[in-house]
Regions:
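N-terminal carbohydrate-binding accessory modules
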Residues: 5-73, 94
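Substrate-binding/catalytic cleft of secreted carbohydrate-active enzymes
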Residues: 64-297
């Protein structure tokens, strides 16, 4: 990372100054190799995380704990965080800059297409987010929404990026794009649970799985066989509140979670560009989520 001091002069007098921390990297994409960092293919894997990214009992963590967070992420063999719904904090992104963790940064969304003043508000927010974070080398993806938007809106978001971040080497896109005209207008496409992935999309730009392993169980129980639980009952999960055959995401033990994590990651690892399935879809994937707090029940 490098620090540059920017100074503002008026009539020869210094009015203001700011030190900007930034970094340099070359970003590209090859349909047969995936995302390229400094011309080297990089398989992006990691977690989808709420932008609050709080610590259990502490809440919003101090900056040194953000660095602990980043080191733990790296130690888990991950190199990517996708923030969900709204932009991650400056402190988180600064930490990812320091530790080399790729970031997908949204602005804001409504879980669906919106219009009129609501859409203009999202555009204004994306403008502000790009200005605030465009010097952060860890950000490779700007996310225009958590659900599909139309071709005109995608073009509008790309125009903002081209104007305010023309040399950042970043991709502008959206989750659950599934029509060819919008895909052509985007620079990357996000999927959820491997829906809508296709080779023609990967030939256009990166496909990123945005949040597999959407489990929402408390995981208080280690396994089904140790007392006093013996296949514990849940209030809402499964038929009659009992665990069903297969993966019931509302009634997972810690043992179930480990198996589901391996199964989920294996799906996208095999479907990655160059993977064993030969589908050649994915450039990256993110599991939901990296956290030790409630995260809205997740």
């Amino acid at each position: 990372l490098y620090r540059a001091e920017v100074r503002l002069f008026a009539d020869g007098e210094l009015c203001d100054s700011e030190v900007i921390e930034t970094g340099f990297r070359k970003v590209g994409y090859d349909k047969d190799r995936g995302v390229l960092l400094n011309d080297v293919p990089v398989w992006l894997r990691g977690y989808a995380q709420r932008a609050t990214n709080e610590w259990a009992a502490i809440g919003i963590a101090p900056e040194w704990l953000k660095d602990v967070d980043a080191m733990l992420i790296k130690e888990s063999n991950a190199n990517h965080i996708r923030f969900m719904h709204v932009a991650g904090s400056k402190a988180d992104v600064r930490s990812f800059d320091r530790h080399g963790i790729v970031c997908t940064q949204p602005a804001g969304d409504k879980e669906r297409e919106n219009f009129g003043r609501q859409w203009k508000q999202r555009v204004e927010l994306m403008r502000d987010v790009i200005i605030a974070f465009r010097n952060s080398p860890s950000i490779l993806f700007w996310e225009a929404g958590n659900n599909s938007i139309n071709k005109e809106h995608m073009a509008e978001m790309r125009a903002i990026k081209d104007k305010l971040d023309p040399s950042g080497g970043r991709f502008m896109g959206c989750r659950t794009l599934n029509t060819e005209d919008v895909i052509e207008e985007s620079e990357f496409v996000g999927t959820m649970l491997n829906r809508h992935a296709a080779r023609f999309t990967a030939e256009h730009g990166p496909i990123m799985e945005t949040e597999y392993l959407r489990e929402e169980a408390p995981r208080r129980i280690w396994d089904d066989f140790s007392p006093p639980d013996f296949d514990y009952k849940t209030k809402w999960g499964g038929k009659g509140g009992r665990k069903q055959v297969g993966i019931d995401f509302y009634d997972m033990t810690s043992e179930d979670l480990a198996l589901a994590s391996a199964k989920g990651y294996g799906e996208f690892f095999n479907d990655r560009i160059g993977g064993a399935s030969k589908k050649d879809y994915y450039s990256g994937c993110a599991a939901l989520c990296w956290t030790d707090s409630a995260q809205h029940g997740r």
